[in-house]
Regions:
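Alpha-helix capping/helix-boundary segments
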Residues: 9-10, 40, 73, 92-93, ...
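Nucleotide phosphate-binding site architecture
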Residues: 10-11, 45, 113, 121
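Short, conserved catalytic or interaction motifs in soluble domains
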Residues: 15-16, 66, 117
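Acidic catalytic patch
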Residues: 43, 62-83
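Acidic, PIN/NYN-like endoribonuclease modules and their adjacent C-terminal/linker elements
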Residues: 1, 94, 98-129
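Short, well-structured N-terminal submotif of metal-dependent ribonuclease cores
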Residues: 1-36, 46-62, 127-129
């Protein structure tokens, strides 16, 4: 797989608010090339929305590989939280990207910059490596 998607990236994609490079990046990860955490599914589907938006979100998520809360992910998330104050969902998403050895595509780069070994890609950047 190419990269790991943060919840905010998926939400921006759903709303069509990513610039063209970000839209192309996310689209390039469809059908087995990118992954997201089960936490992102909870974050994206777990709020009040129209049936149309919910269906669009479910359809989008089905294009990527969902990763679960495996022991290595949980252990890595615990390690991250023991080193610095970080929200549980962010710790799980970062841990998932680390365990699966994928760059994390997120606009919240400031939340993750301190994590050694985690490559970050901002989907709202004008150019994406």
């Amino acid at each position: 797989m190419k990269f790991f998607l943060d919840s905010n990236t998926l939400i921006y994609f759903l709303h069509g608010t990513l610039p063209e490079p970000g839209m192309r990046l996310v689209a390039s990860g469809m059908f087995g090339q990118a992954a997201y955490s089960v936490i992102s599914r909870i974050e994206i589907l777990g709020f009040s929305q129209t049936d149309e938006m919910r269906n669009a979100a479910v359809n989008l998520l089905s294009c990527f590989t969902e990763t679960g809360l495996t022991d290595p992910v949980v252990d890595q998330a615990i390690d991250l939280r023991s080193r610095r104050k970080i929200k549980v969902p962010d710790a799980i998403i970062a841990a998932s990207a680390l365990v699966h050895q994928m760059p994390l595509v997120t606009h919240n780069t400031q939340d993750f910059r301190w994590i050694d070994g985690l490559t970050l890609m901002d989907p709202l950047a004008e150019t994406i490596p």
